[in-house]
Amino acid sequence: MSSTECYGAPPHNYYQDWPTTHSYYPSVPSSYSPLNHHPADIWAAHPSNYIMGNGHVSPPATASGLSPPASRSSNSSAELPTGVTASQHNTYKWMHTKRSQRPAAPKKKVIDENGTNRTNFTTHQLTELEKEFHTAKYVNRTRRTEIASNLKLQEAQVKIWFQNRRMKEKKREKEKAFLARNTWESNSPTSSCSGEDVKNFK
């Protein structure tokens, strides 16, 4: 005995209010083949079969369960802002590295013990200045201008160098004189004759 015989089959009028199964599925022509048709094409041909309860048309789902995009070219062009290409749109902010240009380090000035700035002369400049000093310890303004132009220095730098060089030369002369005097005093006889030595000598 089947279940319908035990409990009794409901009358046929009970199912009259139910919609038939054909209303849930789109009407597909007999020549339909899933290999040569896209769900978007079917939806475009029969949009009324996919009307939802709120009145909006719902496109058919693809094999992955997602609605097919309307147009890739239109979506991509709508998402990109004006003046931005596709390659620029794919980059992110964290991919852009900002490199700040470091300013060039300023040249340090050599400060003397008394707080004045001291010029660092090159070897060539010092050699030429020493040659000029041995030629003439005092130079006039015209010669200072020529020396400064040849050595790419300022006239004031040449003037100060000659002043310092003359002071250095005087200091060396004083030291030489002091050493020479001490050497002569140490080598000179310092013994004195006593009174007894003088009597014995007589």
Curated annotation (Swiss-Prot):
SUPFAM superfamilies: Homeodomain-like (SSF46689). This is Homeobox protein ceh-13. GO terms for cellular component: cytoplasm; nucleus. It comes from Caenorhabditis elegans. One of its GO terms (molecular function) is sequence-specific DNA binding. Residues 114-173 bind DNA. Residues 183-194 have a biased composition (Polar residues). Residues 63-81 have a biased composition (Low complexity). Residues 60-83, 166-202 are annotated as: Disordered.
